[in-house]
Amino acid sequence: MPVTIDPRRHSAALFDLDAVVTDTPLDSTVTLVRQLQGIGVGTAVFSTNRNSQGVLTATGLDHLFPVHVDGLASGKVTILVAAANRLMAQPGRCVVVAVDAAGITAARYGGFALVLGLVIGEDQTGHRDTLRNSGADTVVADLGEVIVRTGDRRMSELPDALQTLGLTDDLTARQPAVFFDFDGTLSDIVDDPDSARPVPGATEALQKLATHCPVAILSGRDLADVIKRIGVPGIWYSGSHGFESTAPDGTHHQNDAAEATIPILEQAATQLRDQLGPIPGVMVEHKRFGVAVHYRNVARDRVNEVAVAVRTAGQRNALRVTTGREVIELRPDIDWDKGKTLHWVIDRLHHAGTQVGSASLMPICLGDDITDEDAFDAVRHTDVGGIPIVVRHTEDGNRATAALFTLDSPMHVSEFTERLARQLSDTQR
């Protein structure tokens, strides 16, 4: 399966010196580093036993790596974290490229986002197995196998939807179908997830909008939880990132392939509660199709400990690990996400017959988090094209996004929703 370095999810890439300087020069490694720098992903070299600066200078590669960290006395975890810190990146947003079991293990136990094993030498089969067994997410023989996602823009570069997005002409030709995330989009992010509520005016705006066009909520929360918090009838609700949904008529749907993981997730939740319970501020949220571990209230020097525990549980239980705003989550390892859920809802709207015809839907998607990027991709790649809007924040830095427009806060989402409902009312008179 191809592996992708994605600037929406990854802020930096840390390379073992032995992955960069080899007996046989690897042009693909240099090409990869230049691609990463071209999209704003920082690069660093780490080594436990060599003068990396001298080696890079001697090989003419020093200009590719502004950061290099050596440490004869330090463990590899310490070196990796130091390299991430010098690039001003959190380990949970870093890729590590390592060539041996020690490097892979250190990256896994450092809580790094993506751990790539690079096979060097003759015994590729045995080496691959060693790297995989040490915890590598993917093992490659050449870094030319790594895909670099391009074409996204940084959140700060996007125009504000309230100021620049004019929909009047589109509304006469195409009917919107509007998809909303909940936390960070309709609700402010709060220290206690259980206290999250829609911002003032959001529920009323959703009710107005739903009288004029299809509306859907795509949330990572449990389905029953998000329905209770919003409480607007006659709209679509999808919980657990789309693994479970209800239609406006109350019909229940779920991803049957994920049902077998329900007891596995329950077991993982119990294990994580026991393991992480002594860490002040951690919250383990068990959902029907997921386990979310919130660390917003955890001391910064213990966040990596939380991430390591969750990633280890994911590998142990064959579950997918995803991240979000101060949360790391386990879910079924199935090819399903908010983007596929969005397509699934649109297909059902087409089959049901919309007011202006199945070819004329205009999907609009609003979200703030990494998991919403799958829906943004889906909106942009629908046959008719749509409008992805990211709700801006700084918790992931000025990260890249597939969105085309931005809004500054959930209050602005409420205002945008109210304005869209009003425009539709005027158009449909």
UniProtKB/Swiss-Prot annotation:
UniProt-listed Enzyme Commission number(s): 3.1.3.12
CDD domains reported in the protein's UniProt record: HAD_TPP
Source superkingdom: Bacteria
Record's keyword annotation contains Hydrolase: yes
Cofactors: Mg(2+)
Binding site for Mg(2+): 181, 183, 368
UniProtKB keywords: Hydrolase, Magnesium, Metal-binding
GO molecular function: metal ion binding; trehalose-phosphatase activity
Binding site for substrate: 181-183
Listed pathway(s): Glycan biosynthesis; trehalose biosynthesis
EC class of the enzyme, as a word: hydrolase
Reaction catalysed by this enzyme: alpha,alpha-trehalose 6-phosphate + H2O = alpha,alpha-trehalose + phosphate
Job description of the protein: Removes the phosphate from trehalose 6-phosphate to produce free trehalose.
Protein name, as recorded: Trehalose-phosphate phosphatase
Organism: Mycobacterium leprae (strain TN)
Protein's gene: otsB
